[in-house]
Amino acid sequence: MTITRFISDWSAITERLADPADRVVAVAPLMERLLPEAPSFITAAHRRPDPMHYARHRLHVASDGSLSLFAIVWQPGQWTPVHDHGSWGVVGVVEGVLEERNYMASDGEIRSDSGIRLKRGGTILLGVGSVTSFVPNPDHIHMTGVPETRKPVLSLHLYGRNMNSFHVYDVAHGTRKLVQLPQES
């Protein structure tokens, strides 16, 4: 599957299906078929790491901002903060093993930026060819990265919006804040 076909197919799916759970069920197999083709569209620039934090490289953003696809480069020891997405998403691993550590709201739904009690959930290890997905319920809260003992990772991340911001959670203080993400190349 080419990246052009992937973009066309997931755009059609999102026009046809409104429910985020239905969208990820339909899009996850497309991501699985796209992963082996990544060498044909991932350039040297898309593989460029950042020594300070994971590097996010934009592959496509829909003109209406409804969808975005990024290649993310992770060096050993690089992690996201605990965060949510405000969207559905599908993630596939091209190289390496990506680790996802999930969190759950102890009180159910989060309604404000303070008084949030999170507890750790499960851990998922995603190897080459693995695909995972998430839907807002009301949102998927996790941290993702690569432990110091593992090799670098290259992953593809598809979101149901232009992923230019997310909530970052301070687990110890029970707060969250909306953080703008840099629009990297």
Model-derived regions: residue spans:
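Ligand-binding loop in jelly-roll beta-barrel domains
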Residues: 136-156
